[in-house]
Amino acid sequence: RSQEAVQSVQSLKTWKQAVERSDTRLTVVFGTKGGRPRETVILDTIAVRKALDNALAIAESCHGRLIDKPDLKSAMDYWHNQAARIGLTGAYSPHSLRYAWAQDAISHYLAQGFNRKEALAIVAMDLGHGDGRGRYVAQVYGQI
């Protein structure tokens, strides 16, 4: 979610510590839908570590922010404009990338030995939906 990305700077150090401890999940607190914290699985530790290192370096050079704007609204506007400017539209929009992540997560859980219903329920929770939303996740994200 875009708001999670923009506000994630508040959790970068915590996430870095989690990765260094070899945790398999990260807790997303800021910018979540309805303000409900959620946990999400780390599918690629190396990629997550690299993204965190890059984000921490950016925050250090931008007054502790990932987007150096005076308020959330202007930061969100900047985020959306920059995403479109670099081609994150259509099949590559941030929400489309969420779909792709969900499909990768479903495959990950299936490979871990979970059955399809379990995998969908876990992905529903990873996405910030309740565990009872597995059927919704199957309909929206689960076309694999």
Tell me the role of every PLM-derived stretch:
Residues 3, 7-51:
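Conserved tyrosine-mediated DNA breakage-rejoining catalytic core shared by Y-recombinases
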Residues 20-22, 60-61, 114-118:
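Short helix-terminating capping/connector loops at secondary-structure junctions
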Residues 43-105:
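Active-site/catalytic core of tyrosine-dependent DNA strand-transfer enzymes
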Residues 98-130:
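C-terminal catalytic core of tyrosine-transesterase DNA break-rejoin enzymes
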Residues 125-144:
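Catalytic-site neighborhood detector that most strongly recognizes the C-terminal catalytic loop/helix
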